[in-house]
Amino acid sequence: MNVSDFHFDLPDELIARYPLKERSASRLLSLDGLSGQTTHLKFTDLPDLLQPGDLLVFNNTRVIPARLFGQKETGGKVEILVERLLGEKELLAHTRSSKSPKEGQRLLLEDGAALRMLARKDALFHFVYEGDEAFLDVLERIGHMPLPPYMEREDEQSDRERYQTVYAKEAGAVAAPTAGLHFDDVVLSALKAKGIEFAYVTLHVGAGTFQPVRVDKIEDHVMHSEIAHVPEETVKAVNEARARGGRVVAVGTTSVRSLESASRAGRLQEFRGDTDIFIYPGYRFQTVDAMITNFHLPESTLIMLVSAFAGYNNIMSAYREAVEQKYRFFSYGDAMFLTAQEPSRGMMLGTDSAEPHQTESRGESQ
């Protein structure tokens, strides 16, 4: 397929640049992957779409204030976007300045903290923080929330709360797992009251999620790599859901990619490592039966993923309908509930055979 097959026209006014006052006040477009039928709902209607015994799998990554501003010792301005923390003192980052930093060069941050460049790794720069505290503490003090470029605004104090899920726990993402932004205590309580089970994965969303696809054929795209962890207790929760006839419902594409990365030929196992899994039409899902997701950018890898899940024609038709109905798009926008166009290969497996492993998997090879 061509990347252009995933284009759709989106009026600028439908891009949500700020969140609604209440997290769960968003709209919810339900799409049946088998029939293609759509239903227009509110996000607070989500419990009505689920059955007791279903399992919701959330991504509990926490967005770090990853954008920094500083200057070189020569006085030139520099902007830094942390891509990945490497322990307490070291990091990989993107930089923006008139000239790229050189090995050994120091960058001075807003409060006098300093980074020294150790090496360049492709498009990223490897830095070490020269202070005594953990660099994450520096980010919390002077960093800015890394809002997506399409918001076309500077971050505000309120983004520290709203560009973060209420269940965020593991620090490391530079973009929010946005499907989770709709959940508040009211919705979570209603889900628990209905007998819906919860489980968690961690995928630290990288800045690569905002990079455009620069090839014509989707098969030629090389996916960026991100750190993911599917713990043994989540594998157990999935197996128990299967045993009682419940569905595995992934909250967001990051949860989908985590679970599918941890599935080997239909076998879900504990997973910890890097994943560059790229899911597009033709991929056979191993574990996920339904998903909650936001509306994604035209020609992005994420609209390719949801097309693989609920059907290309179904998704493109639903997106056109969402535009007509003036749904709000992207990170701070509205949500979709998708069921699969065909059953996953999920099956009941015991956790005694689960073992940690690292893979770098591509969707087309599964």
From Swiss-Prot:
Pathways involved: tRNA modification; tRNA-queuosine biosynthesis
Organism of this sequence: Marinobacter nauticus (strain ATCC 700491 / DSM 11845 / VT8) (Marinobacter aquaeolei)
Subcellular location: Cytoplasm
Taxonomic placement: Bacteria, Pseudomonadati, Pseudomonadota, Gammaproteobacteria, Pseudomonadales
Molecular-function GO term, any one: S-adenosylmethionine:tRNA ribosyltransferase-isomerase activity
Principal EC category: transferase
Assembly mode: Monomer.
Documented EC number(s): 2.4.99.17
Official protein name in the record: S-adenosylmethionine:tRNA ribosyltransferase-isomerase
One Pfam family here: Queuosine_synth
Family of this protein: Belongs to the QueA family.
GO process terms (BP): queuosine biosynthetic process; tRNA wobble guanine modification
Gene giving rise to this polypeptide: queA
Skewed-composition ranges (Basic and acidic residues): 354-366
Task of the protein: Transfers and isomerizes the ribose moiety from AdoMet to the 7-aminomethyl group of 7-deazaguanine (preQ1-tRNA) to give epoxyqueuosine (oQ-tRNA).
Gene Ontology cellular component list: cytoplasm
UniProt keyword terms in alphabetical order: Cytoplasm, Queuosine biosynthesis, S-adenosyl-L-methionine, Transferase
Reactions that this protein is recorded to catalyse: 7-aminomethyl-7-carbaguanosine(34) in tRNA + S-adenosyl-L-methionine = epoxyqueuosine(34) in tRNA + adenine + L-methionine + 2 H(+)
Chain residue ranges for the region called Disordered: 347-366
